[in-house]
């Protein structure tokens, strides 16, 4: 069993867990540049294409709720191997989809199986690290994970430039990544949850564990904070392919760059937490992040209402994504530090809420395909609600932590 690894072993674990964690972002972001092509090829509306993203998010949500508790009972390694293998197969099903209905169904399966990478990478970190090392490794994992939203759409756009490539090719690439990850897990990942720390598996036990988490006021405060603020970012994920390309007229490759630079924003936000977390309490940094998120999205909404220059949208979203990096890193650290044996279930709930909200808001962005206002409005409202959750449900700890 691993415990607080150092040196090369630590770096190897960071790489492996980072690869698992980015499976979700790759699954979400890599095919975004092909949205207009998918709509044309499958004779589908923008909202129907966005529904394929919603299906993926629903799959990620439900999958985490199942995989998390199962891993608390069965260990991390076996469920991970099974799910990632099935992810590779479901990616092939996506590539072979002849119509939008089949693609939506295949995307649900793809999201469901990819959920293991998200939830179990975090649970493994909690198994292996404690205290300040837990916070530092979460920050490192977030930096690795943040590269995916930057690289994924660029990779997707680059793939579409190949003379033989279509949107199907992107899913073939995801299939190959899945099979490579299966080999990596089988060869390099040790079990991190010892038998004596496992929770007996049953529906009743899973419900009881989730119930205890839902009653934990502080935990739910952090969960709802990341749920709404990060969940609202999926309005940007599903909206910008059409806003940037159809409303502002940029090419798929330029869109990929504009979308991808926000990975740098997430990295910057995560770096701020990792760099200053030992000097300023993470809750104080989180407070700054949620306030900044409200301000940035208020500016974004204003710019969409007056049809401001593209640069104003890009800058507002970049600042907003810095706060996403801060919120993701700090909320997971603050929420997970006391979860111990129920880390898998806690990780599942933390990962589920943003995806659940994202699955709701994604198709709403396409209600009016001629304006970016729905995207801006959704991002602003979710930032406000997330901030209210933070200030309302975690305030009992402000005195002792700040």
UniProtKB/Swiss-Prot annotation:
<feature type="transmembrane region" description="Helical">
    <location>
        <begin position="219"/>
        <end position="239"/>
    </location>
</feature>
<feature type="transmembrane region" description="Helical">
    <location>
        <begin position="373"/>
        <end position="393"/>
    </location>
</feature>
<keyword id="KW-0813">Transport</keyword>
<dbReference type="GO" id="GO:0005886">
    <property type="term" value="C:plasma membrane"/>
</dbReference>
<feature type="transmembrane region" description="Helical">
    <location>
        <begin position="48"/>
        <end position="68"/>
    </location>
</feature>
<comment type="similarity">
    <text>Belongs to the major facilitator superfamily. Bcr/CmlA family.</text>
</comment>
<keyword id="KW-1003">Cell membrane</keyword>
<feature type="transmembrane region" description="Helical">
    <location>
        <begin position="140"/>
        <end position="160"/>
    </location>
</feature>
<dbReference type="GO" id="GO:0022857">
    <property type="term" value="F:transmembrane transporter activity"/>
</dbReference>
<keyword id="KW-0472">Membrane</keyword>
<feature type="transmembrane region" description="Helical">
    <location>
        <begin position="11"/>
        <end position="31"/>
    </location>
</feature>
<dbReference type="GO" id="GO:0042910">
    <property type="term" value="F:xenobiotic transmembrane transporter activity"/>
</dbReference>
<dbReference type="InterPro" id="IPR004812">
    <property type="entry name" value="Efflux_drug-R_Bcr/CmlA"/>
</dbReference>
<feature type="transmembrane region" description="Helical">
    <location>
        <begin position="308"/>
        <end position="328"/>
    </location>
</feature>
<feature type="transmembrane region" description="Helical">
    <location>
        <begin position="286"/>
        <end position="306"/>
    </location>
</feature>
<dbReference type="Pfam" id="PF07690">
    <property type="entry name" value="MFS_1"/>
</dbReference>
<dbReference type="GO" id="GO:0055085">
    <property type="term" value="P:transmembrane transport"/>
</dbReference>
<feature type="transmembrane region" description="Helical">
    <location>
        <begin position="108"/>
        <end position="125"/>
    </location>
</feature>
<keyword id="KW-1133">Transmembrane helix</keyword>
<dbReference type="InterPro" id="IPR036259">
    <property type="entry name" value="MFS_trans_sf"/>
</dbReference>
<dbReference type="InterPro" id="IPR020846">
    <property type="entry name" value="MFS_dom"/>
</dbReference>
<feature type="transmembrane region" description="Helical">
    <location>
        <begin position="80"/>
        <end position="100"/>
    </location>
</feature>
<dbReference type="InterPro" id="IPR011701">
    <property type="entry name" value="MFS"/>
</dbReference>
<feature type="transmembrane region" description="Helical">
    <location>
        <begin position="347"/>
        <end position="367"/>
    </location>
</feature>
<keyword id="KW-0812">Transmembrane</keyword>
<dbReference type="GO" id="GO:1990961">
    <property type="term" value="P:xenobiotic detoxification by transmembrane export across the plasma membrane"/>
</dbReference>
<protein>
    <recommendedName>
        <fullName>Uncharacterized MFS-type transporter YdgK</fullName>
    </recommendedName>
</protein>
<feature type="transmembrane region" description="Helical">
    <location>
        <begin position="167"/>
        <end position="187"/>
    </location>
</feature>
<feature type="transmembrane region" description="Helical">
    <location>
        <begin position="254"/>
        <end position="274"/>
    </location>
</feature>
């Amino acid at each position: 069993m691993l415990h607080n690894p150092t040196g090369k072993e630590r770096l190897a674990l960071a790489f492996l867990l980072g690869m698992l964690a980015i499976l979700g972002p790759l699954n979400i972001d890599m095919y975004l540049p092909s949205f207009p092509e998918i709509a044309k090829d499958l004779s589908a509306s923008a909202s129907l294409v966005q529904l394929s993203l919603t299906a993926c998010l629903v799959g990620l949500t439900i999958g985490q709720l199942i995989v998390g508790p199962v891993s608390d009972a069965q260990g991390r390694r076996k469920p991970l191997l099974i799910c990632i293998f099935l992810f590779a197969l479901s990616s092939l099903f996506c590539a072979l989809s002849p119509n939008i209905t089949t693609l939506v169904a295949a995307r649900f399966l793809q999201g469901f199986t990819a959920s293991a990478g998200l939830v179990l990478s975090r649970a493994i970190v909690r198994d292996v690290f404690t205290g300040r090392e837990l916070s530092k490794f979460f920050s490192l994992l977030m930096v690795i994970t943040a590269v995916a939203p930057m690289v994924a759409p660029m990779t997707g756009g680059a793939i579409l430039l190949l003379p033989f490539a279509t949107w199907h090719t992107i899913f073939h690439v995801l299939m190959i990544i899945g099979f490579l990850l299966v080999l990596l897990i089988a060869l390099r990942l040790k079990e991190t949850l010892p038998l004596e720390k496992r929770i007996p598996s049953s529906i009743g036990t899973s419900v009881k564990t989730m119930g205890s988490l839902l009653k934990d006021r502080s935990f739910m405060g952090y969960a709802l904070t990341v749920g709404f603020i990060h969940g609202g970012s999926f309005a940007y994920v599903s909206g910008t392919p059409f806003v940037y390309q159809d409303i502002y007229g940029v090419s798929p490759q330029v869109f990929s760059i504009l979308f991808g630079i926000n990975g740098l924003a997430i990295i910057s936000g995560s770096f701020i937490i990792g760099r200053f977390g030992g000097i300023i309490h993470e809750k104080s940094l989180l407070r700054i992040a949620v306030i900044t998120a409200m301000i940035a999205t208020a500016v974004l909404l204003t710019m969409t209402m007056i049809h401001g220059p593209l640069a104003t949208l890009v800058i507002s979203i970049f600042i907003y994504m810095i706060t996403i990096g801060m919120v993701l890193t700090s909320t997971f650290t603050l929420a997970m530090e006391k979860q111990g044996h129920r880390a898998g279930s806690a990780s599942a709930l933390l990962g589920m809420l943003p995806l659940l909200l994202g699955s709701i808001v994604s198709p709403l962005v396409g209600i009016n395909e001629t304006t970016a206002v729905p995207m801006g409005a959704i991002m602003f409202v979710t930032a406000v609600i997330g901030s209210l959750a933070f200030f309302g449900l975690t305030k009992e700890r402000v005195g002792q932590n700040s």
